[in-house]
């Protein structure tokens, strides 16, 4: 009985040993899901527009408004109508200035009333005289009526340029710093007026349209004063045609008609114009003197633009 028992034990041990040494079936490899890259996970260099945003035009268009009152009574404004007009344009956000000649300052019974009431609206008083020697007198008269004349020579013959400088009247000294307007012949005949927009510094009458940083006075160009030309200028800036830091344009209204000079455009058309211009983020509403100050602060880069 021992032999069969021994043989059985040998067979059992052999079977166990075979089970221990036989390799187990290979485990299946772990499954990995394919992960698609998110667009935001791309390296920055793969997106040039993200790394280098497109440049935007930083040009600013400074639009002012002005009116000249001459010495002839037949073209003087009705004081009440003019004040109502100034109330309307300033309520729109515009900045206005008025240049009045000696005849009106001395002859209009309500001159002081208009000066003070308009200044309360933010209107400035420029110096506009047909006789160059009367500029200090005009400034003096404005102060005597409670006003605050600024440093703008508003309108002049180009031939007078070389004689511009500080003047004193009755102990009051007035010093010019800014020029607006300029004509090569009296009477504003066709082809006489300098109708450029933009700003520059002229050195002399002979080089009136050329920028020279050695000059003393900032020339603020008013352009043609026409609403449609202002629209064209704004659209040109929007299209990137000009890259000057500061460009100027001025609306000019006749005192007796309260319409844009050489035009039938009145307050309704001006309101439409202002609303259109307000859609451009680069438009600023300022007066003439503030335009010159902004240009200086922006680096005094000449921006003369012919509009004739």
Task: List each language-model region with its residue ranges.
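Active-site beta->alpha N-cap acidic-glycine motif
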Residues: 50-117, 244-293, 299
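Metal-dependent polysaccharide deacetylase catalytic core of the NodB/CE4 family, i.e.
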Residues: 92-167, 176, 183-185, 248-258, ...
